[in-house]
Amino acid sequence: MHDAPLRTLSRYRAVLTSAARHGLSRWLAVTALPAVLLVPLLTSSAARVQAVGDGPSGGAVPTANWALSGSASADSTESGNPASNAIDGDAGTNWCTSAWTGTLTIDLGQVRSLDDLGITLDSASPSASATIKTAATSGNWQAVPAASNVALDPGNPMYIPLPPGTRARYAELTVYSDTGADVCVGEFRTFGPDPAAAGLDFGSDLSFTSQELAAGAKFTYHGRQQSPVQIMRENGANYVRMRLWVDPPPGYSNLASDLALARSVQAAGMKIYLDVMYSDFWADPQHQDIPAAWQGQDLAQLTSTVQSYTQQVISAFAKQGTPVDMVSIGNEIRNGILWPVGQVNDPTNPADYDNLATLLKAGVAGARAGNPAGHQLLVMMHYDQGGNNSLSQAFFQNLVTQGVPFDVIGLSYYPFFHGTISAMRQNVDALAGQFHKKIVIAETQYPWTLANGNSPIGDSTGNFVWQPSQLSPGYPASPGGQLSFLTDEMSILAQVPDGLGAGLFYWAPDWIPGVPWEPGTGIGTPNANLTLFNSQGVALPSIGLFRNPAAVCQSYDPWDVPCVVGG
């Protein structure tokens, strides 16, 4: 492990401690580029980017893991590690053989078009090899050419390309231990075009883009230098998330800079997701400060202010021809907004939500009033505990009981703070069943390395995630591990009951070394290993998470060690 994080300043240690207790807070800030400079920086290739088309993957049906909706059986199973663990969407749960070899069979329920297969062998498993077959009808097995006695690397995800035109209902995985010990498989994936995934919105929070470009950062995708906006769009993103503060310090995310970014986003052919924080600076479960200009207002006055402010903001976007498509009334509002007036001190007490509900209703009313006639505006309520169902259900039930109108359940899900991907899946499925609303992962990240990256600009700041104990079992801190985690997360959303899985947004994919987390500190970014670009701004495989994983892995240079490809 790199030792730089161990030398972190005491102030930064406090940040990590608070984040670990409550979730990844968003009070870490950097200066913003003047709004007038945003448009030329972000739209130099707008015409070409716009030609990609609407929706993820530029109109092509995205690839997802069909095994999640299938069933599994095995001829050799160790007690406590059933076959179903291999297709639950979580590489941290295992199917284990009870002998040196065993065969796992997946039934997808119907014949599917398949592009490739994915396998993660548990990191504690002995080294092993595997043979894979597929069949369109029971018993008519066809060998997979690239998976005949292929070596598996414990702990590292592997992708096996299938012959073009493969259609199958069944997939059979036979594993052979190299040592004679039992073999444990974390996940066996069957990837193919999934119409449910085509309905997902895919985007990222690009609020740092202007600062990075101003600092001299350069971003490349397969050797072509482009803006992060262009690169994300080319890889299927159809949304950009942007934060908004009321009256931030000069250069920060204010209305003028957001309007400029919105023009760039629209020019690139994407939609706008506005995160209204109702604060002059970062707002999250630890900070929800009333803006300076609103200080001293009581509940009635704040209610009026919130409604008029929200209406003015939404109207401003509409007037310049870039209407907002989705708005979050507050950011990670588990403990309320506009403290202390709208604070939730006791989440178990329904009466504690009275003031919050009043303020949220005002925000929704303002957003609806500012939205132009005929334009669809989705309203989100954003909760941070994406892996905790009991807390999530209680929060949204209180909002529903109070009559707060909203269209979308937004969740932050950082596995190093919010639990396993299985817990996230259980949460989104249960929320869909209880509330019958669209569900969006509004913020997510996973590390591609544990090293503290250095760019030509330089950065010695410790990272949010710096040690193996913070990783999710089955997902190494590598480009391949990051891709594996995000494809599993996306596949889970595509399988949410009743098609209510609505979208996935990656937080700060371009916050690479060179931009400090607080102006004037000279510290840098603690996010450098959680991006979708390496420290030199080169796009990582996860940029292409909607595509065939085997093809994505094969298209990257070996020096980057993106993932292991069989065959």
Could you tell me what each predicted segment is?
Residues L37, V52-G109, D122-P126, A147, ...:
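Disordered, acidic Ser/Thr/Pro-rich linker "stalks" and the adjacent N-terminal cap
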Residues A214-A217, Q426, A430, T449-D488, ...:
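Aromatic-rich peripheral "rim/lid" segments of glycoside hydrolase catalytic domains that contact
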Residues T77, S98-T101, S123-P193:
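Trp- and acidic/polar-enriched beta-sheet ligand-binding modules for extracellular glycan
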Residues A196-I231:
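Boundary/entry segment of secreted carbohydrate-active catalytic domains
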Residues S204, D275, V327, I409, ...:
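Conserved, mostly hydrophobic/aromatic
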Residues Q230-V379, D384:
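Substrate-binding cleft and catalytic face of glycoside hydrolase catalytic domains
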Residues P228, G374-L378, S390-L471, G480-G481, ...:
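Glycoside hydrolase catalytic-domain groove-lining segments
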Residues A4, Y12-Q50:
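Secretory targeting and sorting signals
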